[in-house]
């Protein structure tokens, strides 16, 4: 009996700092930088169907879903690229467009779900390559797919899913606050912004999670991306000596350590996150009777 329905999960990713690397070959395009693969992400349900459809859901902190989009150009292009028809539903556990890598998680999770559903026998790296090509094409991101292939806090030394990536696990909690979304493509398509980001990129490799937090903050300060709303939150964190920076690319803040929750909750809903120990996974599949 063949599979008719597959559920997959992919963790999200908070980028602390990044440097776009653009190449004519999308496999060699992407970004270098550092970030954190987080425990929350996107659950994907893929079901065989005569026609392709996509629905996007946002779940609240209780897991209750709300449909927020009846289609997705990115996922529809993915289905066409993989030459399959399927009904896709994605359930995002964190706000979209807010620096949590939900777009990448939905994309990579969908590739893994379709791989299992249609028995393509693609390796995890091959799945990541497909997702990365679609991500670069749509400018929905440049480095999140590469990061979300596995867990840990991540240092991407070279671009793309085949790049040199270092991963280390840390058990300390991370707390995040979202103020408003930012459209990633609006930043990636701005030549002036890319030039400023390039000048702000750290000149050394971080040694640990604390170092990533420090370099992320330096990058955020130099890049000119910090808004007045983010500045207010960061100042409050600074007064409590909390390592904190801006979620890239999103209008929000992430901070390290248990005390961060008390500070951040003064400004809105706070998400408690942990570092994910791994990347995408197939949760279960249903077979025809």
Curated annotation (Swiss-Prot):
Reactions catalysed: (R)-pantoate + ATP = (R)-4-phosphopantoate + ADP + H(+)
InterPro entries found in the cross-reference section: GHMP_kinase_N_dom, Panto_kinase, PoK, Ribosomal_Su5_D2-typ_SF, Ribsml_uS5_D2-typ_fold_subgr
GO terms, molecular function: ATP binding; kinase activity
Enzyme class at the top of the EC tree: transferase
UniProt family annotation: Belongs to the GHMP kinase family. PoK subfamily.
Listed PANTHER family: PANTOATE KINASE, PANTOATE KINASE-RELATED
Protein name as catalogued: Pantoate kinase
Species name: Methanospirillum hungatei JF-1 (strain ATCC 27890 / DSM 864 / NBRC 100397 / JF-1)
